[in-house]
Amino acid sequence: MEWEQLEYFQTLARMQHVTKAAKSLSITQPALSRSIARLENHLGVPLFDRQGRSISLNQYGHIFLRRVQAMMKEYTEGKEEIQALLKPDQGVVSLGFLHTLGTTLVPDLIGSFQQEYPNISFQLKQNHSYWLLERLKSGDLDLCLLASIKPENPIQWIKLWSEELFVFVPNDHPLASRESITLNEIAGERFILLKKGYALRMTVDELFEKANIQPNIMFEGEEATTAAGFVAAGLGISILPDLKGLDQSKITKIRVSWPECQRVIGIAWIKGRFLSPVAETFKQYVISHFSE
């Protein structure tokens, strides 16, 4: 059995059409058919059910495909690891982060990093915590910047910084002149929050629970800036971090004296998984940056 046969098999299994698969592989149809026949002969079982030039995987084919895909993944990752070691100061970091960190923090962080490491580039993904963690576990992301998470193997997470959360109200709100309030003072308000599954929403829900508040939630969105816009329109109030670049001309932020309103942000990676030298360099840079 040859490696080339596995590549041919994987392509044919994906396209399920001999002519299209052969064209994709830049070989003739007879050459592809002979290669698959030799593979089936080597395994001792047919891998496809055939109907003319259209084919589909049978029971044996599905089992074998799972193993081939795993082998291909290991092979690809092995090549990438070797290339990364050959060029430790060049490469790409796949970084995921929360929407609320994308206004200035992540751009500023990457900007300062690239002043020292101009040959390292980034693939960036923004989303909520659950989505980021799934992509981290699948290998699509090297690192994530997100709020504190429950301990979960094999995810490694360490704290970087804490940020205060404020109550944002329209400028004409009765509480707008106050410097600070307790959460209980706004228990009867209409709230504009992020959707369930977002790290900030999880933190806010915990604050409501601590204050024994059942919030009247009017709107749920995906962006902190959108929530702030709804507050400016007088549609409710919200609990958000003090985002740089946020238009605060029509809204007022108020500090919460009780309970303590803050969230913890950290960096996450997969323990035991190979981390390319460039990703490791960025990870250590971030940790050092926030420990100063």
UniProtKB/Swiss-Prot annotation:
GO terms for molecular function: DNA-binding transcription factor activity; sequence-specific DNA binding. InterPro entries: HTH-type_LysR_regulators, LysR_subst-bd, Tscrpt_reg_HTH_LysR, WH-like_DNA-bd_sf, WH_DNA-bd_sf. It holds the Pfam family LysR_substrate. One of its GO terms (cellular component) is cytosol. Coiled coil: none annotated. Signal peptide: none annotated. Keywords: DNA-binding, Transcription, Transcription regulation. PROSITE patterns: HTH_LYSR. Belongs to the LysR transcriptional regulatory family. This is Uncharacterized HTH-type transcriptional regulator YybE. It comes from Bacillus subtilis (strain 168).
